[in-house]
A protein has these predicted regions:
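Receiver (REC) domain switch/active-site residues of two-component response regulators
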Residues: 236
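Acidic/aromatic-lined carbohydrate-recognition and catalytic surfaces
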Residues: 2-224, 228, 232, 243-265
């Protein structure tokens, strides 16, 4: 889950991307972040020299003894991370999710897993990190949602539902046949039949992760809104997950297509 990036709606936003391979990552960094720029490096290029600490919230620090790490617990350990010399905390998925794929199956882009805390807890973490000269970025899963997301539940309810075109549907499995199956150990096709919708839906990853339709302007704009929401909260940037697969075209691998790069630019 994987590559390339979007420059968010923030001043002096910048993008860095790794080679277009299945395990590559990408960061969209908001250049106007309040954290200082160590060593006098240009603000927009801070990430090229930063020490990143990749962090799974549930495995880090538990503030209420329920056996699950949470944002208050993480915030209480910021002095330790500062002492380690961390420049930027990279948060693995924490949005609301049924957790069938470690949080990469999001059911609410604007929410936080209840066991981790609240949106206000995330805001407090970011503010306290900035006060210590550290930045915070988060994983942003753009290619697909959980099949439990209200968008998909609406989409499958009726061909006439406004959300129907937020996902990729077909009456046949014979579309985009040149696109490889990524999880060949669990998936036999990139298409899965939905009984309620009476149609196949497209997914490049697990069958419970339907792909969003980036040919739909409403989807493109809503995902920008999601990015803006977290930037407004104080996030300094994102690792954009699985972005090589945003667009599908017949006769291609449907990976790293020109339309994808144009959207992310």
């Amino acid at each position: 889950m994987n590559d390339d990036a979007i420059a968010p709606a923030a001043p002096e936003a910048t993008v860095v991307s790794e080679p277009a391979v299945a395990t590559a990552t990408a960061v969209a960094a908001a250049g106007g972040a309040p954290a200082p720029d160590p060593g006098g490096v240009e603000r927009r290029n801070w990430f090229k020299h930063a020490v990143f600490y990749e962090l799974l919230v549930r495995a880090f620090s538990d503030s209420n003894d329920d056996g699950v790490g949470d944002f208050p617990g993480l915030t209480s350990r910021l002095d330790y991370l500062q002492w380690l010399g961390v420049d930027c905390i990279w948060l693995l998925p924490f949005n609301t999710s049924p957790m069938r794929d470690g949080g990469y199956d999001i059911s609410d882009y604007y929410g936080v897993l209840p066991e981790y805390g609240t949106v206000d807890d995330v805001r407090t973490l970011v503010q306290e990190a900035h006060a210590r000269g550290m930045r915070v970025i988060m994983d942003m899963v753009m290619n697909h949602t959980s099949d439990q997301h209200p968008w998909f539940q609406q989409a499958r309810s009726s061909p006439d539902n406004p959300y129907r075109d937020w996902y990729v549907w077909s009456d046949t499995k014979n579309r985009y046949i040149d696109a490889r199956i990524i999880f060949i150990d669990t998936e036999t096709s990139n298409w899965t039949w939905d009984e309620q919708a009476a149609a196949y839906y497209w997914h490049r990853f697990f069958s419970h992760q339907p792909d969003l339709n980036y040919d739909n302007p409403a989807v493109r704009e809503e995902m920008k809104n999601v990015v803006r929401f977290w930037l407004d909260l104080g996030m300094d940037g994102f690792r954009l997950d699985a972005v090589p697969y945003l667009v599908e075209r017949e006769g291609t691998s449907s990976e790293n297509l020109r339309e994808t790069h144009e959207y992310l630019a």
